[in-house]
A protein has these predicted regions:
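Short, Lys/Arg-enriched N-terminal segment that forms or immediately precedes the first helix
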Residues: 3-15
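Hydrophobic positions on the alpha-helical face of helix-turn-helix-like DNA-binding modules
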Residues: 26, 40-41, 51
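Short amphipathic alpha helix immediately N-terminal
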Residues: 21-32
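Helix-turn-helix DNA-binding elements, focusing on the entry/boundary residues of the two helices
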Residues: 37
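Intrinsically disordered, low-complexity basic tails/linkers immediately adjacent to helix-turn-helix/homeobox/MYB/SANT
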Residues: 68-94
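C-terminal flanking helix
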Residues: 59-66
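Residues within the DNA-recognition helix of helix-turn-helix
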Residues: 54-57
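Helix-turn-helix DNA-binding motif, specifically the short coil turn and the N-cap/start of the second
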Residues: 47-48
Length: 114
């Protein structure tokens, strides 16, 4: 398939509910269970080409969802900004008068990350 397995797994985690049940099943067998196309075809009772086409369509859909919705990119930007906020709050914590507010900011950042 076109995109690496790690990227596909990440896309799947974000957008799994937007795939059909059949696409989910085949995707799970291929990417999570590490079945070959032939093994999946035998288990699903369809042709190897049918498995390939279904997986290719699922991959195309997942990539399209990310292009359109951008959830993964947004979350990556959010994580980077949270790190910047945490670093600035740690710097503020060194100022005695700002320490309580800095602590509150750091706790809020930690809650968001969880």
């Amino acid at each position: 398939m076109r995109t690496d397995a790690l990227t596909m797994s990440l896309l799947y985690d974000y957008y799994v509910e937007l795939l059909t049940e059949k696409q989910r099943q085949l995707f799970d067998l291929y990417y999570d269970q590490d079945y070959s196309l032939s093994e999946i075809a035998a288990a699903a009772g369809i042709s190897r080409q049918g498995v390939h086409d279904t997986l290719a369509r699922a991959e195309e859909l997942l990539e399209g969802y990310e292009r359109t919705l951008g959830c993964i990119a947004r979350d990556a930007r959010l994580q980077k900004q949270l790190e910047v906020i945490a670093q600035n709050a740690q710097a503020l914590a060194r100022i005695p008068a700002a320490a309580p507010q800095a602590g509150a900011i750091l706790r809020a950042v930690q809650e968001i990350k969880e």
